Amino acid sequence: MGLPDSIQRYAPELWDSVRPLYDAGRYAEAADRGRELIEARPDQGFLYYNVACCESLAGRTADAIEHLRHAIDKWEGCREMAIGDSDFDPIRDEPAFQELVGR
């Protein structure tokens, strides 16, 4: 998904239950499951980023931007990653996304 392996290795097992949904294109379900994980582990910035990716692909623009904002708050590197991450293509032209990533 979005974050590099070096970041995901901190708690990859958290995303293991969601990854198959993402891989199957079931983005709304993946986002919903990811939100449950965030409730359990709000300290894990990669969860916010990956949920934002799923929400973007599921057409949940406002939710995607909000979760990306949280991810960036937890790790500034998410801002640069989001610029080139194709998961954000559906929302890339949104003013809120542009403002968030500084474009």
What positions do the PLM features span?
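TPR-adjacent "capping" and linker segments in tetratricopeptide-repeat scaffold/adaptor proteins
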Residues: M1-L14, E36
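Short coil turns that delineate tetratricopeptide repeat
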Residues: Q8, P42, E76-G77
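Start-of-helix register in tetratricopeptide repeats
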Residues: P12, F46, E80-M81
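Canonical tetratricopeptide repeat
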Residues: N50, G84-D85
